[in-house]
């Protein structure tokens, strides 16, 4: 939604800055509606929550893998590459045929779906951010993306550290500091003090690990919250 920081930044402000054309679907994205819309629009960049790719994967790919000649061919090692190319083209065509990159965020990606998309060299990358960071924290081009990660944090624009004795192997809370970190919640000093410390570090509430090159991996939440597949935050 454009009312969200992510939607405002990447579906509105970024296209305005570069002269991009934006298409807002305006309807619930069922696989049928999505495929029909993509055939007309033929987008070059798609920013979406994981559920969009997962729906198309289940609709377009799984039936081929689970039955028919292709399911048999997949079991023959020498045919794998050819089969992957066929599936990749079918998926790309389902999204209009012109997509150069899929930027996914807002919720965890199903590991089975992510693993398969990377196996067929689908142009996918997963980013990470939050409203309080306006909103991007990490992003990596698809050709540099590491499986199960959410990209490298934006070095030069912000600092990120893991509150852990061993940030690479032991999960700790992800802390962020930089110019585009918020100054505080509007007229809510109590909540502001809970997430922003005296040194300017934003305590995200997300638990993660980080590679030496700055690649982030989300491992869970330090707060009680359910994050649904469509990006909705549910507080039980």
What label would you give each PLM region?
Residues 5-89:
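Conserved AMP-binding/adenylation subdomain of ANL enzymes
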Residues 28-33, 109, 132-133, 234:
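Short acidic loop-to-helix transition motifs that present clustered carboxylates
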Residues 54-60, 102-103, 111-115, 132-141, ...:
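Adenylate-forming
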Residues 74-122:
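Short gly/Ser/Thr-rich phosphate-binding loop of adenylate-forming enzymes
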Residues 106, 129, 151, 206:
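Active-site glycine-centered loops adjacent to acidic/histidine catalytic or metal-binding residues
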Residues 109-111, 115-123, 130-148, 165, ...:
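Active-site loops of AMP-binding adenylate-forming
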Residues 148-155, 198-199:
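Short Gly/Pro-enriched turn/cap motifs at secondary-structure boundaries
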Residues 161, 166-228:
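Conserved ATP-binding/catalytic segment of the ANL
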């Amino acid at each position: 939604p454009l009312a969200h920081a992510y939607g405002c930044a990447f579906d509105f402000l970024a296209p305005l800055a570069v002269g991009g054309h934006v298409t807002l679907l305006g309807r619930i994205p069922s696989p049928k509606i999505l495929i029909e819309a993509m055939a007309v629009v033929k987008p070059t960049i798609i920013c979406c929550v994981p559920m969009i790719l997962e729906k198309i994967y289940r609709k377009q790919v799984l039936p081929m893998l689970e039955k028919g000649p292709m399911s048999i061919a997949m079991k023959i090692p020498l045919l794998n590459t050819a089969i992957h190319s066929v599936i990749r083209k079918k998926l790309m065509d389902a999204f209009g045929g012109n997509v150069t990159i899929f930027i996914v965020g807002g919720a965890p990606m199903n590991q089975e779906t992510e693993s398969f998309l990377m196996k067929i060299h689908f142009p996918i990358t997963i980013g990470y951010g939050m409203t309080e960071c306006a909103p991007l924290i990490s992003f990596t081009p698809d050709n540099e993306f590491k499986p199960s990660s959410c990209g490298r944090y934006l070095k030069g624009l912000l600092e990120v550290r893991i509150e852990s004795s061993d940030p690479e192997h032991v999960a700790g809370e992800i802390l962020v500091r930089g110019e585009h970190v918020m100054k505080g919640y509007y007229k809510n000093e109590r909540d502001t003090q809970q997430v922003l410390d005296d040194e300017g570090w934003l305590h995200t509430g997300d638990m993660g690990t980080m590679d030496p090159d700055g690649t982030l991996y989300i491992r869970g939440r330090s707060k009680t919250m359910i994050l649904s597949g469509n990006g909705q935050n549910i507080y039980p």
